[in-house]
């Protein structure tokens, strides 16, 4: 089932939570609403579900306007961050709950419910846990049960509000891969809220980046990461180095160094900022090209196979961070105090207008 969001706005007192949101989600797509706290992502999810009313605009499923339809009639499955399992019910009873409380005319038989719950517990790798209670389960196991319960009623749309936010990093990584695989099997239109950039990039078919109640950018994980539409998106989707300078006819002058800015070839002598991710900075002992920037090594530390190198730009108070492999670090044989050159490999230049760095 596809979702159409047209001109949705929401205000709480003087706080504008959402402003004129337009979004189309195709059938079977897994979409991440990504943004910082207060960006409006959870409010939008709750409006899609029918748990909140929009001040303006419409919500449609498969072209049918459901704006004024109650949540219980929207055929939506909802998974919360904190599981919301019934503590007094065992796993089987939790998963079966939505089926058992249906109107008598719509309620499956006891045999059908048992078959459905057994099938779902196998699907979420929790068969054998039917008689256990939530207190006897780990956080990851509880979230699997919460998802099985949401799927039991065969929703047309699955909505997840930071489903892995309360779990530790290793469990989060395992569960998001599992969710991706589960989605590929079910092909149910799904929308999940997250503030975790890695989670969105790893799981989603498409990412909707939100900020201050507006959509900053929509696209595939590769599109939003490789081609950020704004400084906010660039900064929010990972660490970044900033180079302040002047843009003139396709080049950004940073001190004595020129960085290419072909997208601004018609611009003359204005302030500009180059954005470069740490893994797009290479380090060498000698100046390899005219856009190499002199710097001094301040500090380095390894995390797994990656070494993070902090550098201070020569003649400035600005610091840079580069990410290189352990093998590259060994070959360079650099240490704190060494004078080196850093060269940006991928650069995106923005001209400040309505944003502040």
From Swiss-Prot:
Chief place where the protein resides: membrane
Claim: Translocase is one of the keywords in the record: yes
Enzyme class: translocase
SUPFAM superfamilies per UniProt: MOP-like (SSF50331), P-loop containing nucleoside triphosphate hydrolases (SSF52540)
Pfam families: ABC_tran, CysA_C_terminal, TOBE_3
Residues that coordinate or bind ATP: 35-42
Residues spanning the membrane: none
Alphabetized InterPro entries for the sequence: AAA+_ATPase (IPR003593), ABC_SmlMolc_Importer (IPR050093), ABC_transporter-like_ATP-bd (IPR003439), ABC_transporter-like_CS (IPR017871), CysA_C (IPR041193), Mo/tungstate-bd_C_term_dom (IPR008995), P-loop_NTPase (IPR027417), Sulph_transpt1 (IPR005666)
Sorted UniProt keywords: ATP-binding, Cell membrane, Membrane, Nucleotide-binding, Sulfate transport, Translocase, Transport
GO function terms (MF aspect): ABC-type sulfate transporter activity; ABC-type thiosulfate transporter activity; ATP binding; ATP hydrolysis activity
Disulfide bonds: none
Compartments (UniProt record): Cell membrane
Reactions the enzyme catalyzes: sulfate(out) + ATP + H2O = sulfate(in) + ADP + phosphate + H(+); thiosulfate(out) + ATP + H2O = thiosulfate(in) + ADP + phosphate + H(+)
A GO CC term assigned to this protein in UniProt: ATP-binding cassette (ABC) transporter complex
Residue span, ABC transporter domain: 3-237
Assigned EC number: 7.3.2.3
PANTHER family per record: SPERMIDINE/PUTRESCINE IMPORT ATP-BINDING PROTEIN POTA (PTHR42781), SPERMIDINE_PUTRESCINE IMPORT ATP-BINDING PROTEIN POTA (PTHR42781:SF4)
Family label: Belongs to the ABC transporter superfamily. Sulfate/tungstate importer (TC 3.A.1.6) family.
The name this protein goes by in its record: Sulfate/thiosulfate import ATP-binding protein CysA
Gene: cysA
């Amino acid at each position: 089932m596809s979702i159409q969001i047209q001109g949705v706005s929401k205000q709480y007192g003087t706080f504008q939570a959402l402003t004129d949101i337009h979004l189309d989600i195709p059938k079977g797509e897994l979409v991440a609403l990504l943004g910082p706290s207060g960006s409006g992502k959870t409010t939008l999810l709750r409006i899609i579900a029918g748990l909140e009313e929009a001040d303006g605009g419409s919500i449609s499923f498969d072209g049918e306007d459901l704006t004024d339809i109650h949540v219980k009639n929207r055929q939506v499955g909802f998974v919360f961050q904190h599981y919301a399992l019934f503590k007094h019910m065992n796993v089987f009873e939790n998963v079966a709950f939505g089926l058992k409380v249906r109107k008598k005319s719509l309620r499956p038989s006891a045999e059908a419910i048992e078959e459905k719950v057994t099938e779902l517990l196998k699907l979420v790798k929790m068969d054998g846990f039917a008689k256990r209670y939530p207190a006897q389960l780990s956080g990851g196991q509880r979230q699997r049960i919460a998802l099985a319960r949401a799927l039991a009623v065969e929703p047309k749309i699955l909505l997840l509000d930071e489903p892995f936010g309360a779990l530790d990093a290793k469990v989060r990584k395992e569960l998001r891969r599992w969710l991706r695989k589960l989605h590929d099997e079910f092909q149910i239109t799904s929308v999940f809220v997250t503030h975790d950039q890695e989670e969105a990039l790893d799981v989603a078919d498409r990412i909707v980046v939100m900020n201050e109640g507006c959509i900053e950018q929509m696209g595939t994980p590769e599109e939003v990461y490789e081609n950020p539409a704004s400084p906010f998106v660039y900064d929010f989707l990972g660490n970044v180095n900033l180079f302040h300078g002047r843009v003139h006819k396709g080049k950004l002058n940073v001190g004595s160094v020129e960085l290419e800015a072909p997208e601004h070839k018609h611009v003359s002598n204005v302030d500009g900022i180059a954005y470069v991710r740490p893994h797009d900075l290479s380090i060498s002992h000698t100046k390899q090209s005219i856009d190499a920037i002199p710097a001094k090594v301040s500090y380095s530390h390894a995390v797994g196979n990656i070494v993070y190198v902090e550098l201070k730009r020569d003649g400035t108070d600005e610091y840079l961070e580069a990410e290189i492999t352990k093998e590259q670090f060994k070959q360079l044989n650099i240490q704190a105090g060494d004078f080196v050159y850093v060269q940006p490999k991928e650069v995106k230049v923005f001209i400040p207008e309505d944003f502040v760095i």
